[in-house]
Amino acid sequence: MNHPPPQAPFGRRRLLAGAGAALMVAALDGCKAVAPAPEPRPRPAPDPVLKLAPLRASTDRITQVTVCTRPFRAQGPRLDVERIGQKNIVHNYGHGGSGWSLSWGSSAIAVHKAMTFGEREVAVIGCGAMGLTSGLLLQRAGARVTIYAKDLPPNVRSSLASGIWSPDSRICFEEHATPAFKQMWASMARQSFQTYQSLLGLPGNPVEFIDNYFVSDTAGAARRGPAPEDSRPKFAELQLDLLGDLIPRGEPFGPGTHPFRDRYLRRSSFMMFNIAPYARLLMSDFLANGGKIEIAEFHSPAELATLREKVLINATGFGARALFGDESITPVRGQVARMIPQPEINYGLFYKGVSFLPRRDGLVFQVVGDDDYYGFNDDTTVPDRAEAELAVNTIAELYKTA
């Protein structure tokens, strides 16, 4: 709630005007004495408009540092059908940093294509964001489904994501964002967004909305994109133009209206995925609906011939690069530092190229860099402790009082 500004102090001009009027009354009355005006009591400084619970950002509270390899394709996700031997394979991979965000819409496209073959037994390869949503949507379409996967959550790449609604994050290069692609992408994003609304408020909060604060030391600062002289291709940015009605309007806060001293803030709201309970919910629903999960590892498409199902959905994410020899996949490294949860923290932060998310399954700190080329074409998966501590210490700066 906005507090009214403090009253102006009892200044010299006002005091003199009051004294002059009192003397005039005394002269006219000839007998009345006028008491001097009382000194005003000092008013306390107004409270900040924003009251945010303090974050205990300290490197000794880090519990885990993990690295995720995002599967970027310059032309966008692969959703075509390929026939290999006697198998019809529907591909559903290559979503960059948008996997969880687009999973329901993208998997709906893959499932529609898979069901056109008329088979009632369908296999899914992979048990991450795309694999689980493909399996559930196949069941809803009437299929009997088995998921074959080398690893299960939480030991899949999808479980190592930051957990933010980011449907156009490294989705493709700008030159490949044709009108047809934009239409498909918007459809996937909207279908996913609407599905997520049905998951709000469930036990464990698998999906929830949070307020996020972009913090800067100067007014009007924003995350920088590639420099004008940068000759590298630009990543497509689609959300503002095509999903503008789903994006709440931002709200600015100047110095003195928040706990972060003389900095500038802009508040926005977006969805966040608490990935551990969310993945558990998807797996539980899949198994409860009669789905089967088998541990299996495939090294080439030829090995898929051993499966009894004639129709398969390939949801192997970055794994498709090795399994199907898809060299169009470029790895994008993303590291997060996890920290002991603080249930009272219900807001996110972005400051100096570092993102903080208040996930209930562990607070998340991530260096995201100045632009989307940060971590591009880097397939290293060894955690970098120095980068993790940099992320935590950067956010910790906001809570220093001196």
PLM regions: where:
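Glycine-rich active-site loop/strand segments that organize a redox cofactor
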Residues: 152-188, 242-249, 255-256
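Short hydrophobic core segments
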Residues: 310-316
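Short beta-strand to alpha-helix junction loop
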Residues: 98-102, 180-188, 266-281, 382-386
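Active-site substrate-recognition segment that forms the wall
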Residues: 38-85, 94-100, 108, 128-143, ...
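N-terminal secretory signal peptides
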Residues: 1-11, 21
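Flavin (FAD/FMN) cofactor-binding and adjacent substrate-gating region
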Residues: 18-20, 59, 65-86, 158-160, ...
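A conserved short coil-to-beta-strand element within the FAD-binding core of flavoproteins
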Residues: 292-305
